[in-house]
Amino acid sequence: MPGASTSAALNRAVHRYRAAPFGARLFVHGRAFLSDLAFVERFVPRKGFIVDLGCGHGLFACLLREAAESRRVLGIDLDERKIEVARGAVRDTQWLRFEVGDIIKDQPPHCDAVTIVDVLYLLPFEDQQRVLKNAATALGEGGPLIVKAQERRTDPRFAITYAQELVTVGLGFTRGGHERFYFPSRDDALAMFEHAGFVVEVEEMPRRPYTDVVYLARKAPLKPSPAA
């Protein structure tokens, strides 16, 4: 069911938006219910500097802080309006920050882990590849990249996934897509991760009405140069 994993930390994260504009509050509450962010959060390291790419209104970044006080989190998004809402949810500026940035063109700062949640499908496949490569530049060898995404499948749940995104984009809650989305197949997604320099495993999200998965990637060691 939607929101199968719930947590007190997620409730606290949502509560941070109590003074946000009504539309933003509505979206945040809907996202908290539908996206099962608590399931994704458990795969993120409990401490260190975490960069959340395409953070939107910042709900997942807030959850990361609420769930583990030893995390320092930076959320980056191109939408200035969403970043303004996200900054309104910040109480602990030393540990949680939001910045306007282009995750396709700009390399994120060096960090201990990168997260990307429900973002890549809005980008053409070549831009998805660029985002993954940018994430790789921010990580040391073995550094984790945690990505929640939706897969293209011959599955009734994929029709539900696609229809919901048409609604959210049409209502203006999500930017990008322009009524076209870029959901890769499992094989295509794995190939993109590998091409960006990651080794990756896939975690199925249980009891979901959508084709959601979590890609658990780690930056692969550099291959030694062949002997002359």
Residues covered by each model-derived region:
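A conserved beta-strand element that flanks and buttresses the S-adenosyl-L-methionine
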Residues: 115
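Conserved beta-strand/loop positions that form the S-adenosyl-L-methionine
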Residues: 53
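Class I (Rossmann-like) S-adenosyl-L-methionine-dependent methyltransferase catalytic domain
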Residues: 1-49, 57-107, 146-228
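Alpha/beta-hydrolase fold active-site loops
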Residues: 111
